[in-house]
Amino acid sequence: MRTVSARSSVALVVIVAAVLVWTSSASVAPAPAPGSEETCGTVVGALMPCLPFVQGKEKEPSKGCCSGAKRLDGETKTGPQRVHACECIQTAMKTYSDIDGKLVSEVPKHCGIVDSKLPPIDVNMDCKTLGVLHYKGN
């Protein structure tokens, strides 16, 4: 039986938060500047409940996951924040194979976050394009 390490939990939470970078919903205080240590700390605390869903262990995100996702949705709106989040996703996806990128992309939909603006993110994406582009999903 494999236990989840703190490092893998942090990476997962960063991934889920990055997905939320492109969504629009509730307004909250702005996130710290991209690259600051506080950004990942905030994400970790809010999105830890999403881990079982994005690993495919649960069919739906928990209420705690959705609550954190909605809060973080309002904290990551600028181009630089999207670039930083995308880079975090790529790093984590290269490191942890038990995170399903498709499930990460589904968190906003499952949590009722409307007007999701999520581009397809994979390890080959040029994250810097997110500083000027704002993808509007279908």
From Swiss-Prot:
Keywords: Allergen, Disulfide bond, Lipid-binding, Signal, Transport. Transmembrane segments: none annotated. One of its GO terms (biological process) is lipid transport. The keyword Disulfide bond applies. Gene3D superfamilies: Plant lipid-transfer and hydrophobic proteins (1.10.110.10). Residues 1-36 form the signal peptide. InterPro entries: Bifun_inhib/LTP/seed_sf, Bifunc_inhib/LTP/seed_store, Plant_nsLTP. The keyword Disulfide bond applies. GO terms for molecular function: lipid binding. CDD domains: nsLTP1. It holds the Pfam family Tryp_alpha_amyl. Disulfide bonds join 40-88, 50-65, 66-111, 86-127. PROSITE patterns: PLANT_LTP (PS00597). It comes from the Eukaryota. Belongs to the plant LTP family. Plant non-specific lipid-transfer proteins transfer phospholipids as well as galactolipids across membranes. May play a role in wax or cutin deposition in the cell walls of expanding epidermal cells and certain secretory tissues. This is Probable non-specific lipid-transfer protein 1.
